[in-house]
Every structure is written in C-alpha cells, then in structure tokens.
Swiss-Prot record:
It is found in: Golgi apparatus membrane. It comes from Xenopus laevis. Residues 1-6 are cytoplasmic. Glycans are attached at residues 93, 98, 316. Belongs to the sulfotransferase 2 family. Residues 28-355 are lumenal. It is a single-pass type II membrane protein. This is Carbohydrate sulfotransferase 10. Its main location: Golgi.
C-alpha cells in the first residue's frame, strides 16, 4: 500500500514538471519584438474595411517620391532661384543699365497674354516653344477643352483664341495685374534663337506669312547685301546678321512693324528688369521647367504641357558654328553688342568660338 502511494505521488510530480516545461517553451517562442508590449484586443475588419486600408496603404507608398525625384525637385528649385538672383544682379548693375532696361511700353504689353481666371501673365518670346504655351493658356481660359482640339490657325489669331493682351486693359488694371499675377516667360540661347527665326521665316517661309519673303527679305537685301546686284537665292544669313547688328536697325524695324518680334531682344519684348517675373524658363531645360512652371502657377492639375520630342530643346553648338562660319568677325561682334544683354541677364555664355 505504501509503495502504491509513492508511485502515485511520483506520477503526479512528473505530470506537473511537464506542464511547467510546456509553459516555458511557449514563452520562449514568442516574437522578441513584442516583448514588454501590452497586447491589445484583436479586431477583425470587415472585408470592405480591409480593402480600404489596403488601398490607402498603396496610395501612401505610391505617393512617396523617390530619392532621385526629391533631388531633381530640389535642384530645379535651386536652379530657378539662381536664375532670378542673376537677373536681379544684372538689372541692378548701373554700368549695364542702358543694356538691360526698357520702358513698359505698349509694345511690351502687347506681348503679354492674360488669364484672369487663373491669375497668370505670359510674355510671348517667339522661337522658344511659345506656341505650346499659348495653347496651354487657351485651354485654361476655356476657349477649348483640350490642347488637341485647337486648330493651328487659331493659336495666333487673337480674335478667336480667347487670349486677351495686357495692353487691352486700363492703366490701373495693368498695374494691378503686374503686381499680383503669376508672371513668366521662356528664353533660349540668343544666337540659336536668331537662327531659328531665320530658318522659319525666310527659308521655310510658311504660306500664310508671305510678307517675310516678299516684303521684309527684299528690304534687308537692298540695304545690307554687299553686292546688291546679286539678289538670287533670297535672303542669306549674312544679310540678316548685318541688319540685326546695325546700330541703325530701327529704321527698318519701324517699316516691318510687329513682325520684328521674332528677332528683337528679350529685353525689348518682356522688360525683365522692370517687371518682376516669378519664373523665367529656359528652352534648353524645358522638360524640367514646364512642369515646374505649371506647379508654381498652381495649374498642374488642370493642364499639361504638350509632349516634347527627345533632343529638340538641346543647344546645338555645331549648328550655330556652321551658320556663323560665313559671317565676318566684325558683323558677329556688332550682333553680340546688341544681344549682349540677353546673354548676361539669363546666364548664357559669351560665344567665344565665334570671335
């Protein structure tokens, strides 16, 4: 009897030790990251709430910019800040005042297009992707619902495109808009822009602009071609450069009227030292500048800048050298003297390879 009792006690002791060991094993296998954390009650979400949480998490992940995009945005902001500081520095340089300053005349106000609905002013600088920006404003003003719907012949028809010029407003309204609206324009290497103007107006010569070939070109040839008896082949680039670099070019400018907007300086077009522009984009960096301008103007959710073909905005040094290779050094220097302000104000390097 005594031995049977001892056997029962021993069995009970073994069972007790097994239970203790099992508890210790369970505690040891718990997630170490959860150690010391109070466990909350388990909540089971309905299927609809599970989907909502999953979608929210997905959006949060997708909306987080990559490191590269953050760097790109920071660089773009810094770049535009440097451009603005350079412009203000050159404008305040007394020795360059005659080069950089111009009156806010009707000629300037005619170049600035207005979107009252979105409080935007855009100064037109031809040969720098200007047409595409006008399309953006036309859509914003509500004349067309999309850029693709705008007929090409309407873009520059200011009776039909719904783009009022700043010159159409009263002096008080002009003042208020210049002081409170978002203002921008685009620039390009000055000499490459002149080449683009020459090719577009005097080489390709669109059919709906016959006056460049039939009126303006002959007038330049008569005054600036060295051998005036040789008039075959139309206007040559050398003739064009002599006209633009002539200190007395205004005589023909008055004769040509507003057609000169395709080759006059940015200073004459937009008065950047008199008007405090928010952004000045560069044609060479338009792929980055266009989205930046839309963001700064607060319209990036309303319209997009048209797709830019690869490489089309890149500065083509060899093309510039080729066009100027037949122009005399004297004529190049005179041309640079006139456009020096555009080079300095917007940070373009002096074309030393042309001298």
């Amino acid at each position: 009897m005594h031995h049977r009792w001892l056997l029962l006690v021993a069995c009970f002791w073994v069972l007790f030790m097994l239970m203790v060991a099992s508890k210790l094993i369970t505690l040891t296998m718990k997630d170490p990251e959860g150690y010391g954390n109070k466990q909350g009650p388990l909540t089971v979400l309905p299927e609809t709430e599970k989907i909502a949480v999953a979608e929210t998490t997905k959006l949060q992940i997708e909306s987080q910019p990559t490191t590269n995009s953050l760097k790109d945005e920071s660089y773009t902001v810094l770049l535009h800040k440097e451009r603005t500081e350079l412009l203000r520095s050159v404008c305040s340089n007394g020795s360059l005042r005659n080069l950089s300053h111009t009156a806010i005349s009707k000629f300037v106000l005619d170049r600035i297009f207005v979107s009252d609905k979105h409080r935007i002013l855009f100064c037109q600088t031809p040969k720098v992707g200007n047409t595409q920006w006008k399309k953006v404003l036309i859509v914003l003003n509500g004349a067309f619902s999309s850029i693709e719907e705008i007929p090409e012949n309407v873009v520059h028809d200011h009776e039909k495109n719904g783009l009022p010029r700043l010159s159409s407003f009263s002096a008080q309204d002009v003042h208020e808009r210049l002081n409170s609206y978002f203002k921008f324009f685009i620039v390009r290497d000055p000499f490459e822009r002149l080449i683009s103007a020459f090719k577009d107006k005097f080489v390709h010569n669109p059919r709906f602009e016959p006056w460049y070939k039939h009126d303006i070109a002959p007038a330049i040839i008569r005054k600036y071609r060295k051998d005036r008896r040789e008039s075959r082949g139309g206007l040559q680039f050398q003739d064009f450069v002599r006209y633009l670099g002539d200190p007395n070019h205004r005589f023909l400018d008055l004769q040509f009227g507003d057609h000169i907007i395709h080759w006059v300086t940015y200073v004459e077009l937009c008065a950047p030292c008199e008007i405090d522009y928010n952004v000045i984009g560069h044609h060479e960096t338009l792929e980055d500048d266009a989205p930046y301008i839309l963001r700064e103007a607060g319209i990036e959710h309303l319209v997009s800048y048209p797709t830019i073909p690869p490489g089309i905005t890149k500065y083509n040094k060899s093309k510039v050298e080729n066009y100027f290779s037949k122009v005399s050094k004297r004529d190049i220097r005179r041309l640079y003297t006139r456009f020096e302000r555009d080079f300095k104000l917007f940070g373009y390097k002096e074309p030393t390879f042309l001298f």
